[in-house]
Amino acid sequence: MCDSKDNSGVSEKCGKKFTNYPLNTTPTSLNYNLPEISKKFYNLKNKYSRNGYGLSKTEFPSSIENCPSNEYSIMYDNKDPRFLIRFLLDDGRYIIADRDDGEVFDEAPTYLDNNNHPIISRHYTGEERQKFEQVGSGDYITGEQFFQFYTQNKTRVLSNCRALDSRTILLSTAKIFPIYPPASETQLTAFVNSSFYAAAIPQLPQTSLLENIPEPTSLDDSGVLPKDAVRAVKGSALLPCIIVHDPNLNNSDKMKFNTYYLLEYKEYWHQLWSQIIPAHQTVKIQERTGISEVVQNSMIEDLNMYIGADFGMLFYFRSSGFKEQITRGLNRPLSQTTTQLGERVEEMEYYNSNDLDVRYVKYALAREFTLKRVNGEIVKNWVAVDYRLAGIQSYPNAPITNPLTLTKHTIIRCENSYDGHIFKTPLIFKNGEVIVKTNEELIPKINQ
């Protein structure tokens, strides 16, 4: 096994050391750190009236007289309770999502009333108006805990119109005025959790160690194909269903049965080529690494994230609010570039300086991301092959006195200039050693 002896990376028996290599760690991700309100759908009620709320689905809300609420195209009465989950963002705010339809609270400003904005139900987009700060408090008379929701840097507070009557309660946000709010306003903005449903949350797998590069056992042994390679789990994260596109489930079913999806990050040795090279002969071999544009676009569509040219993670609007939690769980860094990783095709010339024919098999490190539902079903996976980490095994290896030599290296195509580097040649491949491309070993490609 390729075990790590310190924080610098791979141990000597696995090859050359290098930094920033994913180490074996225990899962420290979302389902171990989430607050209860992010693991349950609570029936949100006003503290004083104990009534539920109504929610609009209209795209054109308008205000009603002086009430801190608005008229709605669809209303729910107290006999139709709504259950809400609060997805925790990296900055401590929440996305408030409805179990019934999978949509989220959205503060929709209206030009008719600048003081009161309606809360409507919309698809999650990652916009600021869908993010709420929850602040806990307590009643100085009863001692009962309650909480309030703020938007726009605490300049607006979620308000529960008609909180003291038995009719349907409508939600809005009210502008916070100076000094102290009237008692009625306090009553309108105080909420408590009532009954709940548990969210559907998958378990995180244990991490594992990456095995050594597979060795061929005969001249006829062509090595291990990618589909048969042993995977090592290096990290995993829970993805709120609101950022995931599942082609087989609508928003409502995702919210009820897959409140969170599991994204696993695995590594394995991906075979680039396998060939018998005759004694004292040179062969030309084409190597294809990186990730195709089709695969990147699929990852963007389904996860709203993608892989950067430095193999770090990049995020779009839906996923960006959760990026710190996701990268921490996956044990992957944020990308230091905005350039998207592309496909890389190289032509290599290898020379066998031995007095016998040798079977050589070359592998590169593959970084695989797999999206799973709560029941373990695989939705999709994405693989990026890292050209910077590669090694060769051979058969026979005991009689060999001279290692394989890379005599010429040419880039045929790389889809971005960020990874447009070549090896200094000649380069010696020792059997089973992981060759690491560092800045000192690379010659920058000259831009034409």
From Swiss-Prot:
Region of interest: Beta-trefoil domain: 1-198
Source domain of life: Bacteria
Modification comment: Processed by proteases extracted from C.pipiens larval gut; unlike its partner BinA, it does not form a stable digestion product.
Gene3D superfamilies, A to Z: 2.80.10.50
Keywords: Disulfide bond, Sporulation, Toxin, Virulence
GO molecular function, one term: toxin activity
Disulfide bond sites: C67-C161
Biological processes, Gene Ontology terms: sporulation resulting in formation of a cellular spore
Renumbered residue ranges of the record's region Probable pore-forming domain: 199-448
Compartments, as annotated in UniProt: Spore, Perispore
Summary of subunit composition and partner proteins: Forms a heterodimer with BinA. Upon toxin crystal solubilization with NaOH at pH 12, only the 63-kDa (binB) and 43-kDa (binA) proteins were detected. Interacts with mosquito protein Cpm1 which acts as its host receptor.
Biological role stated in the UniProt entry: Component of a binary toxin active against Culex and some Aedes mosquito larvae. This subunit alone has no toxic larvicidal activity. This subunit is responsible for localized binding to specific regions of the host larval gut. Binary toxin internalization into host gut cells requires both proteins.
Note: In protein gels runs as a 63 kDa protein.
Protein family per UniProt: Belongs to the toxin_10 family.
Entry note about domains: Has an N-terminal beta-trefoil domain and a C-terminal pore-forming domain. The trefoil domain has barrel and cap subdomains; the cap has 3 possible carbohydrate-binding modules while the barrel is involved in host cell receptor binding. At neutral pH the carbohydrate-binding modules are accessible on the toxin surface but the barrel subdomain is not. The crystal is very stable at neutral pH, upon ingestion by larvae the crystals dissolve in the alkaline midgut.
Protein name, as recorded: Binary larvicide subunit BinB
Name of the encoding gene: binB
